[in-house]
Amino acid sequence: EVVFCNNDAMALGALQSIEQAGRTVGTDIYLVGVDALKEAVQNVVDGKMTGTVLNDDVGQATAAANATKLYVDGSDVDEYYWVDYVKVTTENAAQYL
């Protein structure tokens, strides 16, 4: 079974319920959140969450600022600017603490 949460706050609540039910993340259920909150990332490091996704606010702000500068300077502006999400797992979680 897998629990996908729209944000880490939901994932942390789901983790409480999973533990209260006697289940073990990584053994009989998987748990993933979004936002890479420190508490969630620590739970990934500790093996209590399968992963989280970093919603790169710095990258988004940089893309928005760059697009704004292009617009103000009279340059062409793309309709969309994509900023990749970062998958945070046990392999890379420590660098996001």
Language model features with spans:
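Short beta-strand elements at the ligand-binding edges of bilobed clamshell
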Residues: 46-58
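Sec-exported extracytoplasmic/periplasmic mature domains
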Residues: 15-23, 45, 49, 66-73
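Hydrophobic alpha-helical
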Residues: 1-42
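Hinge/cleft segment of the Venus flytrap/periplasmic-binding protein
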Residues: 56-97
